[in-house]
């Protein structure tokens, strides 16, 4: 896996301010003003692939409430992004049937990504929904068709685990729910250890709370090996395509007997990294 050419872990984000695209520098704190660099006609993904400094233009400081955030590096056309991930990658989920390469699934194109505060859509006939707090790797495919790692963020891979448990061949259907993603792109090696907690509210009251641990240290698999196998398939190597790869999760509310329902609010607090995702689940029909 090719890693960014940066020594310290920097944080970048994209947003719209006064109708124009900007790059943000650093992890925002509360309602503090944001430091932004106008993107102009530049493309952030191209800048990162070229090793250019996206912050080489003059920065402006603006009120946090006047910007609209975007998923990191999300192309303007949803078809320019693929959202997928691996299943049962963590040591706590290893059993006698664990394969040498974890199952990979496709959640959808770029339009399934949801930022904090947006609804997470799930099928109205879902059997048993659960949250999955995960590290998300971001890769950009270069002109030669090579997916190159540019950083990581955090997400919630909402899953109909009940459907998968009912029929093991239905993993692909179980994953066809929206995925929450943080707008921040961490420019460094994937984190070894991430800790935090989940809070699920129902009708404004606490419904369930639990802790989670994730990161590469929690994986049963070698990250380089599973990513190399995934990107050995030419079908995934379209130049310019952005890949969001969810790395799998610790045990969730489902394993504690809780079932997420329509209108539940799910909050994932990645405490170790200062990132919070909070979304309301909506079960909708076609």
List each language-model region with its residue ranges.
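Catalytic-pocket segment enriched in acidic/His residues
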Residues: 2-6, 155, 161-286
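Active-site microenvironments in enzyme catalytic cores
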Residues: 2-21, 27-31, 36-202
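Short amphipathic beta-strand/extended segments with alternating polar/hydrophobic composition
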Residues: 24-28, 33-48, 208-216, 275-285
């Amino acid at each position: 896996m090719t890693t960014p050419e940066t020594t310290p872990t920097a944080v970048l984000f994209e947003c719209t301010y006064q109708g124009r695209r900007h790059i943000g520098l650093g992890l925002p704190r509360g309602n503090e003003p944001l430091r932004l660099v106008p993107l102009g006609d530049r493309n952030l993904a191209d800048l990162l692939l070229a090793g250019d400094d996206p912050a080489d233009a003059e920065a402006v400081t603006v009120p946090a409430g006047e910007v609209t955030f975007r998923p990191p590096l999300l192309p303007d056309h949803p078809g320019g992004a693929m959202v997928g991930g691996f299943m049962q990658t963590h040591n706590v989920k290893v059993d006698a049937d664990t394969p040498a390469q974890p199952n990979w699934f496709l959640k959808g194109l770029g339009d399934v990504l949801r930022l904090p505060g947006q609804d997470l859509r799930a099928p109205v006939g879902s059997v048993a929904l659960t949250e999955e707090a995960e590290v998300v790797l971001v890769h950009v495919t270069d002109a030669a068709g090579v997916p190159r790692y540019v950083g990581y963020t955090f997400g919630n891979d909402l899953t109909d685990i009940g459907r998968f448990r009912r029929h093991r061949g239905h993993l692909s259907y179980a994953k066809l729910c929206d995925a929450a993603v943080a707008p921040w792109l961490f420019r460094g090696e994937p984190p070894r250890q991430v800790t935090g907690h989940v809070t699920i509210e129902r009708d404004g009251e606490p419904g369930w709370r639990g802790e989670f641990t994730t990161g590469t240290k929690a994986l049963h698999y070698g990250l380089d090996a599973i990513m190399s196998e995934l990107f050995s398939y030419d079908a995934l190597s379209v130049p310019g395509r952005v890949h969001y790869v969810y790395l799998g999760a610790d045990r969730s509310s489902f394993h504690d007997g809780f079932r997420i329902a329509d209108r539940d609010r799910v909050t994932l607090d990645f405490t170790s990294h200062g990132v919070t995702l909070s979304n309301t689940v909506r079960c909708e029909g076609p």
